[in-house]
Swiss-Prot record:
Signal peptide: none annotated. GO terms for cellular component: glutamyl-tRNA(Gln) amidotransferase complex. This is Glutamyl-tRNA(Gln) amidotransferase subunit A. It comes from Bacillus cereus (strain AH820). Belongs to the amidase family. GatA subfamily.
Amino acid sequence: MSLFDHSVSELHKKLNNKEISVTDLVEESYKRIADVEDNVKAFLTLDEENARAKAKELDAKIGAEDNGLLFGMPIGVKDNIVTNGLRTTCASKILANFDPIYDATVVQKLKAADTITIGKLNMDEFAMGSSNENSGFYATKNPWNLDYVPGGSSGGSAAAVAAGEVLFSLGSDTGGSIRQPAAYCGVVGLKPTYGRVSRYGLVAFASSLDQIGPITRTVEDNAYLLQAISGLDRMDATSANVEVGNYLAGLTGDVKGLRIAVPKEYLGEGVGEEARESVLAALKVLEGMGATWEEVSLPHSKYALATYYLLSSSEASANLSRFDGVRYGVRSDNVNNLMDLYKNTRSEGFGDEVKRRIMLGTFALSSGYYDAYYKKAQQVRTLIKNDFENVFANYDVIIGPTTPTPAFKVGEKVDDPMTMYANDILTIPVNLAGVPAISVPCGFGANNMPLGLQIIGKHFDEATIYRVAHAFEQATDYHTKKASL
């Protein structure tokens, strides 16, 4: 039995009782990485020397009264979250040699909680992708079946947790990039409310949509991690000054009287039968615990995909303009003048998907098209947000599938961008509205690949979605299933 089969609270107790050491936890992580990483390919960079030194330092503090629950816990960090002195590439060749000189706020907070960073996790380049096949280095595989994708863009973050390489990880979610891979890999992933977690130190893809969040084996562990990284940050102007409650207090298993909305659009055309049936089965479980549900409509969700790709690509075209070979990152050697420097550095450094989205965004923002595309997309975004607010006036949570289908095979969709984009049709509306949502395991498809249940909450009401997710988790055994890698 792996130490990582235990929860954070169980491991904390073992540490305090001196049944295990922090070094044991770190070595457990690196041993598992040595055993499976050649197949899974979840990591881009390991930090073994520093992690082992930190573990030794923390071992001397075991049993101290001020040790928090995350003390000594091994974590993986998505490679678009900057880490001081530890290579951060965004899985792009253009940043292949980039060593940041500061820590992201979330990394600072986790260091203050005495977690130990095991390494940096693979992803789709600059978080643009749904399968991890867009990594500029190599594709991560799904631990449940190496022939399948782990999802994206936080594919490495989800795969590392599912494979037992780390206890938990950080990902980022712009249009589903935490929840979708969490669903595909059979783990728990939360996208917090926009502004709940500081984005300072997150390399920007689409600044009005990006959010950092936790990926874990259980809902309880997820709540511990969100508790540690949430809160106002003066370094991030979009960070919200909203009180962070006690997420653990609501994990009682009680959902009696809870009002659940189920959008008909989330169970209709484009959603596979396996995903639909798994959600209906989950609703029966929650009904049996005293919750009620009704079908509702989110009428503008059908426009979410087009809206998202116009807005996110527009923001990306601006955000990625800084990668020009002048200030940091890789610089082309094939240069005769300044224009060559810009053009060749970006042509050689960016992958196809990143180039595709930069071009789309530049077009949407260009003179003569701004009103027709970008401005109209912003107006539709407001309508989508209003849809959610109208539903939440009468219901506590919204529930549906996280993805239309289980994970697909490696190479199956990589040459068809539109089919690939459709994997995010159920997660994107949440980002456009800025509300929080969690994915928890809720079954398996015919290919024995995991399915995820998406629970969506009101702005800054992560506590309620944790309560529902935890109640469902404890009433079922899906969270106990493990990839047999």
